[in-house]
């Protein structure tokens, strides 16, 4: 299952806006933001869980968490799975924005189960499973309260078989 890890919170105020950053040397000290699966899957599973975990610590309860692409696809899943029992998280909504449907965060179910700590319940065709693999983006789309794309044109394109990347 998912291991306990240090989550640092860095904050900065700029032009009257408070920014928070998730810190973890193990996951975020590499030379590039994207590497290769399954390393990226583990890193972004950590990030998704960390985002939710820090909210009560910093005393910020958002109305909406806006997720972008597969890298944050587990935020709506984790919110549904392990955070809804906590009153703090009840009623928080999620929006999943798709920038590029080609990149979905796909890997075998066993590895993703080990990385995420999610139960068998989540690995079904109507949830994270797609063509017998686990799919972070699909999970985010299934569990998000709303789905958006970067444009109306892109929204129409990805509804077609060619651009639907097997999620049509």
For the regions a language model picked out, list residue spans one by one.
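Catalytic cores of nucleotide-sugar-dependent glycosyltransferases that transfer UDP/GDP/TDP-activated
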Residues: 1-168
